[in-house]
Amino acid sequence: MKEFKVLMFGPQRVGKTSVLSSMLKQFKSETAITDINISLTPDEITKDVVEAKIKDLKEIFDKKASDKSDDRWTIDTNKTPAKEKYRFIMSVAGAADDIGITFTDIPGEWLREQSKKTANGEIDNVTEKELQKELQESSVIIVAIDTPHLMEENGMYHDACNFGGHVNRLIQQSSGEKMCPKLVLFVPLKCEKYYHEGRMDEVNKAVKDKYKMAIASMSKGEKAENYMVAITPIITLGGVVFDDFGRDSEGYVEIITDNAMSFSKPEAAFYKLYDKAPKFAPKFCEQPLLYILKFILDITDFEPPKKASRSFIKEVFKPTKGMKSIYNKIMGKGDKIEIGFEDLLLLNPQILIFGRAMQYVFTPEAQNNIQEAVLKLKVSGSGYEVLQNPFEK
């Protein structure tokens, strides 16, 4: 079974688990009313988490509908204490095998911890090492963004809540290394207020401004050939909107300060029911999964151009018989390949090997089924934008 890893990082309590739960629910709803032959099944542990979360989200509306004593409240009070993994099996009709998709949710504190280095320049921080390992092994990176902290008070509390500087640093570091092709999604969450007010273009612009260093690092020179990048906002609840940060008697935002970590952020964020539609009505939650399918589909057929001479590559890489054997094993399979090993190295080897492997999993029938699903991909409107996709023909 081909394994596919997705890394999610962002602030605690931003609602990453809620999005996964709604993603599964909405994807099942979309496929149930169409002829798309793709299923997504959680393992038993993930299933329990997802079902419990959906129940909790629906109860928000049930409780508030019956209790009018408090018209606003805080949400997402339970933070993830440690790294969590959520596993799904994706089955596509006609595919030679299923695809295992594992979502890894990184605790918010990991992003804030400063990396220390030894005298030899090596990272001396357990969580930093583990985070770097997850970054390298993951094909998809989801940057979850708390939208009220991004937008309110002129974005004053964005860095403290969303770790904007740390996210920029991590992506800049990872994009500087030779890696397999990656899909990077910037996913603003809790967007309901701005969605209902018709301000999603403002959210899009704020994301591009606050994460401009990370975006720039993935779009320069040869690095641009490894990354598909998009902004994909999600309406997590639909009928709940941000109201305001907690304020003192004089109207100033009440903040909490951590001198050790050097940050200050609002002590509380309050939400209220959206009067016009006070019900659980998530939107776009299936889009990250559709983007993953689009990414897989594009990678499967990707053929990048040559960039250097064969003699130069032979001199630099000095291919061994063992390397050629691995190459032949992956690229052969009875196909007539009109490309030599040195030519492979002229291209992006990770992309070609990954794409060729996916071709054996996804037969033409399976690719057609994925293509049907990808037709529902949202690429514009409501703050959506594909910033770059070097793999698309």
Regions from the PLM with identified roles:
Residues 74-139, 149-156, 160, 164-169:
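Switch II of P-loop NTPase G domains
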Residues 12, 134, 281:
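Aromatic-acidic/polar surface patches that form glycan- and anion
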Residues 2-3, 7-8, 28, 259-276, ...:
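C-terminal non-catalytic interaction/localization modules
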Residues 5, 99-101, 140, 183, ...:
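Structural motif
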Residues 2, 15, 136-137, 180:
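Residue-level preference for short coil/turn positions at secondary-structure junctions
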Residues 137, 141-333:
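Conserved GTP-binding G-domain of TRAFAC-class P-loop NTPases and closely related GTPase folds
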Residues 1-111:
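Conserved G1/Walker A P-loop phosphate-binding module
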